[in-house]
Amino acid sequence: MAACIAAGYCAAMGLGRSFQAARTLLPKPASIACRVHAGPVRQQSTGPSEPGAFQPPPKPVILDKRRPVELERRFLSPEFIPPRGRTDPLKFQMERKDMLERRKVLHIPEFYVGSILRVTTADPYASGKISQFLGICIQRSGRGLGATFILRNVIEGQGVEICFELYNPRVQEIQVVKLEKRLDDSLLYLRDALPEYSTFDVNMKPEVQEPNQKVPVNELKVKMKPKPWSKRWERPNFNIKGIRFDLCLTEEQMKEAQKWSQPWLEFDMMREYDTSKIEAAIWKEIEASKRS
């Protein structure tokens, strides 16, 4: 009898151990899992956020410190700088005041010789009382309120140039279609170049450019028509870099043109016009005008 009871007790103990081992392999019940995680976790509310509600942390912003910091590029329009040799600054100071007031009404963007512009002006003889012209800027001249710029385009095989006054009240909009520079400060030689270098679609769409991006320089060199030209562009006094002289002139003609060179002017320090102090004073006037 005792042996039977002992055998039954051993069998029950073995069955209990096997059941406990199998139980550890099974996943825990939901009640146990909830009992374990119920303490530290807060229930998320579906309604409006409360002051003590949980908010996810913001996404980290990764900055590349190896990349150099881009400084803000400032552009001072050339007509603000008075010509050299003028001793009475009052006239130019009064003109700059009027120019800054005009710029509050009309946005005059940054552009250079070689940029493609679209200008809208008031025209009493046009059907819509306005007219538009698109072309490449071939020259900027004048100082103060008398600043001008020339746009050129070839329309139906005919070269058309219009000289606009920058601060003319009839100018309603100046749009930069393509901002770029050229190798030269004046592109008047396009009058003697092939028409393809002055032909632009009047329906061109403006190109988007980042504000702090450097202005690209177009290193295009044009091909000229056969002589005669309007001026002797090959002579050193023009200092032209954007013409393929090797395609239109012989070596003898180039040597003849070099006779007009004046290499000593490069070392003449009196010809340099230092405008750093003038530009600093003009920038102060511009900042004061923006605050007013």
Curated annotation (Swiss-Prot):
GO biological process: translation
Any GO CC annotation of this UniProt entry: mitochondrial large ribosomal subunit
Keywords for this protein: Mitochondrion, Phosphoprotein, Ribonucleoprotein, Ribosomal protein, Transit peptide
Lineage: superkingdom: Eukaryota
Presence of keyword Ribonucleoprotein: yes
Residues covered by region (Disordered): 40-61
Protein name: Large ribosomal subunit protein bL19m
